[in-house]
Amino acid sequence: MPQVKLKEGEPVDVAIRRFKRSCEKAGVLADVRKREFYEKPTQERKRKKAAAVKRYQKKLARESVRTTRLY
């Protein structure tokens, strides 16, 4: 859990903003959303495999663009 210490003379709203930013960087909200509902192991594997395929397709598309530029 991210922690933010209030600096001397610092307004509370600035500290809250720093806290929100640190939570976002730590991925707290994304983790909470992911765990909001139970996901069966088969569904989790299926989701991860689909994400891997998508990443691979994106990588191939990026490489093909990189090789076709001849200028």
Curated annotation (Swiss-Prot):
GO terms for biological process: translation. Disulfide bonds: none annotated. GO terms for cellular component: ribonucleoprotein complex; ribosome. Pfam families: Ribosomal_S21. The keyword Ribosomal protein applies. It comes from the Bacteria. GO terms for molecular function: structural constituent of ribosome. NCBIfam families: S21p (TIGR00030). Belongs to the bacterial ribosomal protein bS21 family. This is Small ribosomal subunit protein bS21. It comes from Acinetobacter baumannii (strain AB0057). The lineage of its organism: Bacteria, Pseudomonadati, Pseudomonadota, Gammaproteobacteria, Moraxellales.
